[in-house]
Amino acid sequence: MKKKFFLLSALCLLEVQWSMAQAPKWVDKAKRAVFSVITYGENDKILNTGNGFFVTEDGVALSDCSLFEGAQRAVVVNSEGVQMPVVSIMGANDMYDVIKFRVGISTKKVPALNPATAAPTVGANVYILPYSTQKDRSYTAGQVKVADEFSGKYHYYTLNLRLKDKMVSCPVMTEEGQVFALAQKSSGA
């Protein structure tokens, strides 16, 4: 029994080591651009929590619009645990559940994700980077299942991976480490 347990444990450790070795090189740097969003309502009571990510080094960020509904104020908490206030809403679209806002950054610049220079094609490998304060290189890998174009220049992607609740509003990245989408729940979810 001990031999089976030891063998199973060893295999699990090898699988973890292998998956860590397979992480793209850009994951460590990119994960620092992902943060947690906390919105507050009346009497400074927590209203919602979720995720977001920086798209510019001067504090412009994206998240899902529904987090901010009814909020009096909001803060973001970066991967190092530093809390920064949301200072302005730059744009919002409740139909597509996306919000663009500016954060009052506490340093000269923050880590930001670069936008994709080309739209990924069906079958392309993609990665979702969840928010984490840990130094791990975790991500979720998948592929583009469907890429639908709308409004002549935008794309809506369906991915063949299981989206956990904690992954909503996290960046979806190309193999080159460029962000091309904001993870959202399926409309049927």
Language-model segments: what does each one mean?
Residues 30-39, 104-111, 136-189:
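Active-site region of chymotrypsin-like
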Residues 34-36, 51, 73-75, 97, ...:
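Conserved beta-strand and immediately adjacent loop positions that scaffold enzyme active sites
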Residues 56-129, 134-138, 153-156, 166:
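Conserved active-site neighborhood of the chymotrypsin/trypsin-like protease fold
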Residues 4-14:
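Sec-dependent N-terminal signal peptides
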Residues 20-64, 73:
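N-terminal activation segment of mature serine protease catalytic domains
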Residues 14-20:
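C-terminal segment of classical bacterial N-terminal signal peptides
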